[in-house]
């Protein structure tokens, strides 16, 4: 059942106090209750550039994120607003407004770099907001993008000296789409006398400069990072909404009081975000919902607080630990529910119980497979197998006890009148033994005819008869109509009958052991079958992701080559070859 969203306004998600980042428990609690997939849009930019206004528009509200009207930065840390997605039913739009970068009151670029990195890691669409044109000053202010290789790791590696550039080659596989919003844009969009669209203007602005000087490298570095890390890019330009003096009242003004061009530009921006922003997805096609976003926030913030780099692989593994543990419990609960509905104890045979177990176990494994991911070394599936085996053994024990109780009760009802007759001396007379044996056979027949006695029926009966051997022998010995020879023959007959019953019970016990062993093997094969199918699906999913990444890298390499940047093209070619090698290995590793 979909969870209801009741956020009337934004709430601080990650607090920034004295340069220290902390996750807000109240915001995490809200996330933990949201089960729908999430489209996460984060906006970052210099302070006092109007980021919050755009986010309020995306929320469909005039007020919400604090706009402020002074040169002081209002937003501290990262603020969150979860609203129903206006274009994607069953999805939640999560808006993340961030602390303004470059706030002179902070004087701390370290904090800004972490805010920037967290916005990238948590979002599926990353909006960078700035004032004016994309000139060198704008690029210099975006130096945070060049810091990402020092702030984020894609893979967990025991080698602390692993090349950051090599690690950053994987960024493209999980980084968000990039949108650059240019506010108060007053120039004509053109280059070399030719009109440009905003997207063409962005592409033009990201062109590299040929040369090897320090100045050229400084010019190229942020551009290279944007091109390499964010292959899908979009640009929007916005006219000044009103005269400067009215900017302080922007959230109070009606659209009719704003520049019509600006109103249309904002509408175009919102329409693009609503239609094109993707659901936040992790490696393996795992769609992020509230609890998963909560886990990511905690993992990343805790890593930063402890002096480590936030690592995508670690975050996914931490999330997998939580979800796989829950998947085991969910699977066990399903098994118990199914067995509770289907099983009536005692069952007529062990096989009947094992067949019900097998069906319920298969469904439980399916529940686990659907709910789990990144189960390293299959530890959680092994845990599930162990718990299911214990549950099976518990049901077998309960079945045995239920059968014993049922049979003991039947024996009491059926045979107690006979015992009373023996006590009364009815069979202590000539010919009494034959009467006793006939009555015993009749009662045994009646016992066998009773339904749903279960698997202990024979054992309980034979145990009872054995306990009454002295009584039977006493009646035999006192019967004067029988010769000594006949008595001896009768004793031997009783012994043979008892031995035959014991042999039958032993045979039945061996058959039960064989059934248990066969069931254990079938259980193993069922786990293996479903695991193999999941591994194959995961392999295909990863190959699809790698193919998308490869296509983006090939596109960027071709563009670098076209622009004449041989060195950068060679670096990209090496990344492409590494990725192709991984893909060949994965394709060769067909699960059979």
Curated annotation (Swiss-Prot):
The modification Phosphoserine is found at residue 156. The keyword Transmembrane helix does not apply. Gene3D superfamilies: Guanylate-binding protein, C-terminal domain, P-loop containing nucleotide triphosphate hydrolases. GO terms for biological process: cytolysis in another organism; defense response to bacterium; defense response to protozoan; defense response to virus; innate immune response; non-canonical inflammasome complex assembly; positive regulation of pyroptotic inflammatory response. It is an enzyme of class 3 (hydrolase). CDD domains: GBP (cd01851), GBP_C (cd16269). The keyword Iron does not apply. GO terms for cellular component: cytoplasmic vesicle membrane; cytosol; extracellular region; Golgi membrane; plasma membrane; symbiont cell surface. Its EC number is 3.6.1.-, 3.6.5.-. The modification Cysteine methyl ester is found at residue 589. It catalyses: GTP + H2O = GDP + phosphate + H(+); GDP + H2O = GMP + phosphate + H(+). Residues 1-311 are annotated as: GTPase domain (Globular). InterPro entries: G_GB1_RHD3_dom, GBP_C, Guanylate-bd/ATL_C, Guanylate-bd_C_sf, Guanylate-bd_N, P-loop_NTPase. A lipid is attached at residue 589 (S-farnesyl cysteine). Coiled coil: none annotated. Residues 35-278 form the GB1/RHD3-type G domain. It is a lipid-anchor. Isoprenylation is required for proper subcellular location. It is found in: Cytoplasmic vesicle membrane; Golgi apparatus membrane; Cell membrane; Cytoplasm, Cytosol. Residues 590-592 form a propeptide. One of its GO terms (molecular function) is GTPase activity. GTP binds at residues 45-52, 67-69, 97-101. Homodimer; homodimerization occurs upon GTP-binding and is required for the second hydrolysis step from GDP to GMP. Undergoes conformational changes and oligomerization upon GTP-binding and hydrolysis. Heterodimer with other family members, including GBP2, GBP3, GBP4 and GBP5. Dimerization regulates subcellular location to membranous structures. Interacts with SQSTM1. Interacts (when phosphorylated) with 14-3-3 protein sigma (SFN); leading to GBP1 retention in the cytosol and inactivation. Belongs to the TRAFAC class dynamin-like GTPase superfamily. GB1/RHD3 GTPase family. GB1 subfamily. This is Guanylate-binding protein 1. It comes from Pongo abelii (Sumatran orangutan).
